[in-house]
Amino acid sequence: MAQHLQGVIGKLANRLQRRLMAQQNRAWEFDLDEGILDAARLTRVVTNPMHALSFKKERDTNFRDTVVTLLLDNSGSMRGRPIMVAACCADILARTLERCGVKVEILGFTTRAWKGGQSREAWLAAGKPGSPGRLNDLRHIIYKTADSPMRRAKRSLALMMREGLLKENIDGEALAWAHNRLLGRPEQRRILMMISDGAPVDDSTLSVNSGCYLERHLRQVIEEIETRSPVELIAIGIGHDVTRYYRRAVTITDPSELAGAMTDKLVELFDETSGNGESDRKQKQRARRPTGPRRKTH
């Protein structure tokens, strides 16, 4: 099954690479003193023999210094086939983007415990004060940094399948964390892709706070990024309608569709070399960068 999966993802990755490489070689410089002879301008030499020959040269376009962050839901509901597919997609697509000169960071998020960790113990010791906020300890994982080559991350990605790693998912703080890492990058274009299979859930937190506490915080973080940040945000939901939260999103019904969805969305983003996508980024870059969500869990 793993080999078949790699083959399917590999074909999609090759399609992505062909599209990206075609974009890189789309521009030409004309009227140069050296390069490839420009046959279209030979008539000038015929009509005026004293006119020098004209040459042209292909010009690379490197996607304006781009970095992509893949943020993967490492919750318990992803156990088994979904997390294996997600890890395989991240691996192969990151290698593909890397070959095209695009840097990729791969991150994951879960919690350290099922029913609250030290955060809950501290709350109990304090006498259970009201509205405590988050009552579980976060686990944010860096599987691959943007500056490290993909060949060094192979063993790290295998950790996603480790027994006992996948627990609860507190999406809002994970999204803010990944976003802040991107804000510190020097690249001109920064893309954040969230892959999740459900709404934020942590039983320890939700049992003692107001309803939709984690979901409300997630919506606040998304709004900050989508309206005030230069980072381009996109989400893919596995069996979960993420279009309820994100402006730019797609929902798939089965993990086997993940590679196709990721590839399609990346092609769509990189096709935005002009037009509305570019103008949207410029508008966001003129806005104030977010300092974080208006209401933080603690």
Q: Which residues does each predicted region cover?
A:
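Acidic, glycine-rich A-domain
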Residues: 1-298
